[in-house]
Amino acid sequence: MPEEKNTFYITTPIYYPSGKAHIGHAYTTVAGDAMARYKRLKGYDVFYLTGTDEHGQKIQAKAKERGISEQEYVDEIAEGFQELWKKLEISNTDFIRTTQDRHKTSVEKIFEQLLEQGDIYLGEYEGWYSVSDEEYFTETQLEEVYKDENGKVIGGKAPSGNEVELVKEESYFFRMSKYADRLVEYYNSHPEFILPESRKNEMINNFIKPGLEDLAVSRTTFDWGIKVPGNPKHVVYVWIDALSNYITALGYNTDNDTKFQKYWPADVQIVGKEIVRFHTIYWPIMLMALDLPLPKMVFGHGWILMKDGKMSKSKGNVVDPYMLIDRYGLDALRYYLLREVPFGSDGLFTPEDFVDRVNYDLANDLGNLLNRTVAMINKYFDGEIPAYQGNVTEFDQTLVDFKNNVVKEYEGSMDHMQFSVALNQLWSLISRTNKYIDETAPWALAKEEDKRTELASVMTHLAENLRIIAVLLQPFLTRTPGEIFLQLGLQEENLKKWDSIYGYGEIPEGTTVVKKGTPIFPRLDAEVEVTYIQDEMKGSAPAPAEETAEVEALETPQIGIEDFDKIDLRVAEVKQVDKVKKADKLLCFQLDLGEGKLRQVLSGIAEFYQPEELIGKKVIVVSNLKPVKLRGLMSEGMILSGEKDGKLSVIEANSALPNGAKVK
């Protein structure tokens, strides 16, 4: 049932404007937008924040290269981000820029407070600094070191692969170690603070247990930043400057802090996995020092990768979101981003997968359902939707029950930010509705005059399911739901609201559909469009490169018998199973391993099981296999099966074992 109205504050990271906004930025921001739209539909007062982090040495260097001022440079790049958000129809409430006076003033007050209460002190720092990462590293943290003939370290590379230089300077430090125990206690008492669960374990084992060192929070080697109050040769470093945006945008530390009082703490902060550490260690410790409540959740999502690894102009694999929107439409890109990759995991972008999603999911499954429904209502009832009657055909109640179950599952998935799972559940309703047409055979009913009541019932159930599907699509797609409402002739706003999905038979008798609906997603010529996208991606390279064999970036490791003890076997509960298109032997599983998110695993058992047979079973999974791509889908593990006479049977675990239990 609909929830009581409340506030909901969601943020993306503020993006560093050192280059053009790309599909990775779009992915994060579209995900946040889907959540913001979902909560608004459910009646929440939503504040959705995004923005740009505009200070630092890299910005200063980029502006110098261009021969323009730092402010001119960031103005230009920030405008590009806002243009992309407009093109993606992002419904953000605010766009914070760290060069804005509202941010600067609040940051100065935050720094002064931390200094006065002794959480910040003045000292001297020497370490290996990466300009690109804007981070210091100890010698032991370097991925690679360069030594002179005497063995002295003279340089190296950060874990990111970026070059480092030795920097020694006076710096203000934040007493991180003072809050380490308190932070771990908070993790333990708030299990959903860091999601997925694996990110929390990484923070504790890799950063907190080895011991938190005090953090340098000012710089003197560049001056493009907020000056430290009372000591202007220092600029406030990124940790306090950038991370504070989530509260400065709400008016924290100002005379008008109404928004801060209303919306803080944030309900969810979405970040890429590479900056989880900053948002789950530095940021909460800073808030503890300020005596402010911590965000309720920090969700670290994975990366969108290419077959040859990360996007790079030199590799010719950069995906331009503007190109995809202009050629295929906004909703095609928004759908692909959140359907293709389980949120929280890494995933691959391929032109083939993108075109397949448009053709199979959007054009065939959804588009054809709408086209057939509108055409039949015009043909059999002169374009008017008949009055609703329940349980007329033997298939009606089954369809309604299926809808009710999907709505429940969909809301559960959305509340846990499992966007791909929610869309998968929604598409199961689309598939079930298409199957309902085959079951009821309206073309046969139309031939018998005494079956007129049954035929009318089929039309109303199809129209009603499409209406509900359109409502459920609204968090993800910004234009398609309106087109579905338009073609069904639905003008009343109450038919488009979230509360309307809990009932059935809401469409008024006599509602007139359009005479001939335009296909909402025209089918693409797969060969032509795949080639087009590939050529556009290659066009991003500065010069032609030699042809190389196409290698998958993620390969399944070879494990010998002597390494068997390295295999991590876990109990997993099957939550969702789907057939894989164009692959007769594969099933796609969504598994709960107790990680705080579902894991996608593909298994070649489709000829031995129907998908619905497997839902709810406890299976055993090899959980530490490197992800591999099968038929365009990522598989993050392997389900164990036994074989007899050529038939595979899934090995089931005791149902009493908890999800994620280790098998020994």
Swiss-Prot record:
Q: Which SUPFAM superfamilies match?
A: Anticodon-binding domain of a subclass of class I aminoacyl-tRNA synthetases (SSF47323), Nucleic acid-binding proteins (SSF50249), Nucleotidylyl transferase (SSF52374)
Please name the GO terms that the record assigns under molecular function: ATP binding; methionine-tRNA ligase activity; tRNA binding
Catalytic reaction list: tRNA(Met) + L-methionine + ATP = L-methionyl-tRNA(Met) + AMP + diphosphate
Listed A to Z, the keywords are: Aminoacyl-tRNA synthetase, ATP-binding, Cytoplasm, Ligase, Nucleotide-binding, Protein biosynthesis, RNA-binding, tRNA-binding
Name any Gene Ontology BP term: methionyl-tRNA aminoacylation
Concerning InterPro entries, the annotation shows: Anticodon_Met (IPR041872), Met-tRNA-synth_bsu_C (IPR004495), Met-tRNA_synth (IPR014758), Met-tRNA_synth_2 (IPR023457), Methionyl/Leucyl_tRNA_Synth (IPR015413), MetRS_core (IPR033911), NA-bd_OB-fold (IPR012340), Rossmann-like_a/b/a_fold (IPR014729)
Matching Gene3D superfamilies, A to Z?
2.170.220.10, HUPs (3.40.50.620), Isoleucyl-tRNA Synthetase, Domain 1 (1.10.730.10), Nucleic acid-binding proteins (2.40.50.140)
Tell whether Glycoprotein is among the UniProt keywords: no
The tRNA-binding domain sits at: 563-664
Where would I look for the motif 'KMSKS' region in this sequence?
A: 310-314
Q: What is its EC number?
A: 6.1.1.10
How does the record describe its quaternary structure? Homodimer.
Function statement:
Is required not only for elongation of protein synthesis but also for the initiation of all mRNA translation through initiator tRNA(fMet) aminoacylation.
Q: What is the protein name stated in its UniProt record? A: Methionine--tRNA ligase
Q: Report the source organism.
A: Listeria innocua serovar 6a (strain ATCC BAA-680 / CLIP 11262)
Query: What is the organism lineage in this UniProt record?
Result: Bacteria, Bacillati, Bacillota, Bacilli, Bacillales
Primary gene name: metG
